UniProtKB/Swiss-Prot annotation:
Gene3D superfamilies: 1.10.1390.10, Glucose-6-phosphate isomerase like protein, domain 1
Source organism of the structure: Campylobacter jejuni subsp. doylei (strain ATCC BAA-1458 / RM4099 / 269.97)
Catalytic activity: alpha-D-glucose 6-phosphate = beta-D-fructose 6-phosphate
One Pfam family here: PGI
Name the record gives this protein: Glucose-6-phosphate isomerase
Active-site residues, record numbering mapped to chain: E353 (proton donor), H384, K512
One GO-annotated biological process of the protein: glucose 6-phosphate metabolic process
């Protein structure tokens, strides 16, 4: 494949950009009164309004041409068919198989993986049922009231985000806790709130060798044994999500309480697998099934719909437009419901670990920008924090505004206030406010001319700031499944366009390797040859703790 910037469709986009780059969205809406209806898509429980973007019909046509020149349709097919598209690790990428709701087989090297997928899912269902019904008892015959998931990265964030988002569907007796940081404080805070006789620990580590996870797991094990006294009781209070049976058994966990997943499931794409055990325990097997169903529906939409009606494809291509032509270095996720407060952080990992790459699949360095910085917060909080920069700052940062349509609980007025802010912010980003409009407004309020001249420039909004609005019918397991799968596929499409491998994460490894050496030095070993800064920092630590 040619470098992106040498493709004829990319060059056509460059020419088009020089024509359209300063065109204001006000003009686009004025020229097309149906723009808001035409630039609108629905798939299942999700609705996407992408009309408030700096695009025209010609822009979209050229972006679709780019997707075709990059053989996107064939690349989508290759992923779903189990081809080894993770070329640096020679692995298939089949998180989609985990939510396959059909009877069709999914093969890797001519072997159908669906029987194994269904077997692990059934095992998860049986175990979660035993906890939820109270038939699984702790070492003192108490029922389990607290579940602590110990993991990091993909073994933590996905399950954490879903459990927080869907807490209204949780079992009333169960309390779910997540521990990822190795600082000790997070684990200590959890252990102070739970009782050993009624707590279950899930240790989530594919290799059962992740330093941070095992440090926390062994600390939890030590805390538990301080009360339970006998190692045989570990079997009732610790389970593992892993592939390393021997290490799991050595820890004291019974092999039948180990839940398997596979190397064709990337960590950040793994909440649909046994890594989602915490989700199933907390929400129940029916709601977990609805989560999978929502993702499956988005998979079907992504695979079958033409690009012109394909939600992940359109979101991805619009993102390419901003990153590679407008030089937008970041993208913002702003959910307007507090239960989705972990969603920006989850997408941050999903996107930045997938597409934070500078080497093409052929081993050559890119000569264009790739993955953006992803950041965000819940919408109303964000309005009173960083929206100032979005409205009047010097950076162009596209934003996804996410909200649900369903009036919740006994406070419908709150929800209407919330949605009014969503729609108003998107309109304000698009329209802005001109100097003339500001001056006229100030004059109507009776301000003097000298005050108007002095203050008016500070109240001008340039507008033309892009946004997508994503509306969920309601926050439900199915809609959350679709929402996550939407972003998974968007990220995949962008990786295809940039010709990078979205499914490895070598950038995680270097710091971990260096940390092993430095850890031995901090513990008193001989300091190796580092740079002067690192040597100095190690010595500062040793001196501080020498007394």
């Amino acid at each position: 494949m040619k470098s992106l910037t040498h493709l004829s469709s990319y060059r056509a986009l460059s020419t088009h950009f020089s024509i359209i780059k300063d065109l204001h969205m006000r003009v686009l809406f004025k020229e097309d009164e149906n723009r808001g209806f035409r630039y609108f898509l629905q798939s299942g429980d999700l609705k996407l309004d992408y009309s408030k973007n700096r695009i025209s019909d010609e822009t979209l046509k050229l972006l679709f041409d780019l997707a075709n020149e990059c053989s996107l349709k064939n690349k989508i097919k290759a992923m779903f068919e189990g081809q080894k598209i993770n070329n640096t690790e020679n692995r298939a990428v089949l998180h989609t198989a985990l939510r396959n709701k059909t009877n069709r087989s999914v093969k890797i090297d001519d072997m159908d993986i669906m029987p194994n997928v269904r077997e692990v899912l059934a095992k998860m269902q049986k175990f979660s049922d035993s906890l939820r019904t109270g038939s699984w008892l702790g070492y003192t015959n108490q029922i389990i009231t607290d579940v602590v998931n110990i993991g990091i990265g993909g073994s933590d964030l996905g399950a954490l985000m879903v459990c927080k988002a869907l807490k209204n569907y949780a079992h009333p007796r169960l309390h779910m806790h997540f521990v990822s940081n190795v600082d000790g404080t997070q684990l200590q805070d959890v252990l102070e709130r739970v009782h050993p006789a009624s707590t279950l620990f899930i240790v989530a580590s594919k290799t059962f060798s992740t330093q941070e996870t095992l440090t926390n797991a062994f600390t939890a094990r030590k805390w538990f044994l301080k009360h339970a006294l006998d190692e045989k009781h570990i079997a009732k209070h610790f389970v593992a999500v892993s592939t390393n049976k021997e290490a799991v058994k050595d820890f004291g966990i019974e092999p039948e309480n180990m839940f398997e997943f596979w190397n064709w499931v990337g960590g950040r794409y793994s909440l649909w697998s046994a890594i989602g055990l915490a989700i199933m325990i907390y929400l129940g097997k029916e709601n977990f099934s609805s989560l999978l169903e929502g993702a499956y529906l988005m998979d079907e939409h992504f695979y079958n719909e033409p690009f012109e009606k394909n939600m992940p494809v359109i979101m991805a291509l619009i993102g390419i437009w901003y990153i590679n032509f407008f030089d937008a270095g970041s993208h913002i996720i702003a959910p307007y419901d507090s239960v989705l407060r972990y969603f920006p952080k989850f997408i941050q990992q999903l996107d930045m670990e997938s597409n934070g790459k500078q080497i093409r699949k052929n081993g050559k360095k890119v000569d264009y920008d790739t993955g953006p910085i992803i950041w965000g917060d819940t919408g109303i909080n964000a309005q009173h924090a960083f929206f100032q920069l979005l409205h009047q700052g010097t950076h162009l940062s596209p934003i996804d505004l996410i909200a649900s349509l369903n009036k919740k609980g006994n406070l419908p007025d709150h929800h209407e206030i919330l949605l009014s802010n969503v729609f108003a912010q998107a309109e304000a980003f698009m329209r802005g406010k001109t100097l003339e409009e500001v001056q006229e407004e100030m004059a109507k309020k009776g301000l003097k001319e000298d005050q108007i001249q002095k203050l008016a420039p500070h109240r001008v909004f340039s507008g033309n700031r892009p946004s997508n609005i994503l509306l969920l019918d309601e926050i439900h397991p199915r809609s959350i499944g679709s929402l996550v799968a939407l972003y998974e596929h968007k990220i995949f499409v962008q990786g295809v366009i940039w010709d990078i491998n979205s499914f490895d994460q070598w950038g995680v490894e270097l710091g971990k390797e260096l940390a092993k050496t430095i850890l031995s030095e901090l513990k008193g070993g001989k300091t190796q040859e580092h740079d002067s800064s690192t040597n100095h920092l190690i010595q500062i630590y040793k001196n501080f703790n020498s007394n």
